[in-house]
Every structure is written in C-alpha cells, then in structure tokens.
C-alpha cells in the first residue's frame, strides 16, 4: 500500500474544475514520480519500471531541508511559512511541494541541480517575480502548479518538457505571442481566475501548441477567444461574460468533445454554430439567458450530455434534441438537464426524448414562475 501521507498530498494538489472531470486531467499519484533509475535504489525487481513500495524500507535522504518531509524522492515543504525556496534539496528529487508558504520570488539558482524534477508545486504563495532562468535546470519538468500567486505575466522560458501548466488565480491580464514558444509537449493549461479580457490575447499567442485541455474560466471574456489551438478536446470558458455564440466562433474546434460555457450571459447561439463540432459529447450551457433550446443538437450524432438548466427557456419542441423520423443513427443521450426554466414540463411531449436512454436521464421540473 502506498504511504497514506503521500496519497493525501498528491490528491490535495488538484483544484476544483467547472464541472466533473472524468479522470482526464485529475492529479493523482503518477508513476513517473516514483521511477527509479537503478536497481540499487529500489532493492526490488525493476522489470516494470516502478518499484514495489510494499517491499521498501522507508529511507530518508541525507539532504532534506529543515522542517520538510523527504521520502521516495518526494520533498514536502508545504505550510512552513517559507520566504524562499529552501536549499539542500536532493538532486534526485522528482516531486517538490512548496505550496502554502510565503515565497515571493523565484531566483536564478533556486532549482539548480534538480534535473530530475518531474512535478513542482508552488500553489498559494506570494510569487510576483520569476527570474528568466529560474526554470532552466528543470529539463525533465512535466507538471508546474503555480496557481494562487501574484503573477502579472506568464513566466518566461518555461521548460520544453512541460506537459501541464496550472496558473489560475493570479493577476495575468495578457497572453503575448511567443510566450508558449517551444512547448511542443504541452497538453493541458489551466489559466482561469485571471482578469483576462479578449483583447489580452495577442494574435498567435497559442501558436505551436497542441493542447487537449484548456480552461479560461472566471475571467472577463465577452466572447470565445480567437485562434485557440485546433487540437483541443476540452474547452472550459464557464463563469465569464460571454453574450453570444456567432457562426465563426467554433469553426476551428472540430475535435472538441467537451465544451463548457455555463454561468455566462449567453442569449443567442447563431444557427449552424454547433455544426462545426461533429465529435462533441458533452455541452454545458447552464446558467445563461437562453430563451430556447439551441438549434442543431439533433445533428450532433455523438452528443450524450446537455446541460440547459437555469436559463429562460419557455418552450421545448418535439425535434429539439432528437432527429426526425426513424432509423437515423446517433448516440443516445444519457443526460439532459432542463430544470429551473420557465417551460411548463407537462406540456412537453414524451416523444421529445425518444433518443434518451432512460427517463431518469432527464432532469425537469422546478420551473421558474
């Protein structure tokens, strides 16, 4: 059994997302943190690449900063009131946890010698300044969590090995062109909770990125940003001030399977806008100002979940969700939420939901008066 404290630490690092994440980017115990490079280090069969933790006798590196806990290449220095990055960190460290401290600056040599570091956690500090070469030694860094700090810009010269960047809840107002240059491995960026407006994204800001996941929630967006990566599978823009979805807004995002637009001010979705999303499986439009079900849902043959609750929908047509006629192939819905709308649910014809797996998948009632 993996040490309980280590599991607790790693699970605590993930931040709440706008709606349920089905394991796509949840931060759990990653085997990469525990990989051993030599048999002597593990004392067990290394054919699998991961040591048998049950057979290991707990050992502590001779290099462990005062007050920190060091075990199995994990250095935990959280909640210590640290003002700076501690010294005497073992060079074979793979996870360094510095969250919940008072660090205000990352200096040039703070991470010197940590060439094996895989994950760096700096959440909830007071970081406002980062030296341009602070991350240079981190040639194997894949996960950088630097949320809930005082950053006003995205750090320069991020490691090219980086896969996941969580930089939400800072003070970033601008995403300049070239800031992500060379990050060919980047897969996930979480940058919600920053005062970003549409004008803050320079043309080409995301050039070269092949992201699967992007979240820009709880910002100041009034529309869907232009020129986001075409490779996106998940795009979360909830809790903004978006008022409308125009025809060209979703044109380049044909690979999306989850789109989050809940908690905005959307009144209008232009006809045909959703036709550019042939692989869409999950659509969140709850807590907006829609007066009708968006057009085009029956044509999205893979769509299975639609959240439309807490809008101003007054009528639901018999063909709003399902294709007309019989024999038209499409995936069955397993979730449609329409509660907290002013539509009288007793007036909706049962055939409206003929392509839903089960009546329990339909959330209706609690209509607005």
UniProtKB/Swiss-Prot annotation:
Keywords: Disulfide bond, Extracellular matrix, Glycoprotein, Leucine-rich repeat, Proteoglycan, Repeat, Secreted, Signal. The two attached glycosaminoglycan chains can be either chondroitin sulfate or dermatan sulfate. Found in several connective tissues, especially in articular cartilages. The keyword Metal-binding does not apply. GO terms for cellular component: cell surface; extracellular matrix; extracellular space; sarcolemma; transport vesicle. Residues 17-37 form a propeptide. GO terms for biological process: articular cartilage development; blood vessel remodeling; bone development. The keyword Manganese does not apply. Transmembrane segments: none annotated. May be involved in collagen fiber assembly. Homodimer. Forms a ternary complex with MFAP2 and ELN. This is Biglycan. It comes from Rattus norvegicus. The gene is Bgn.
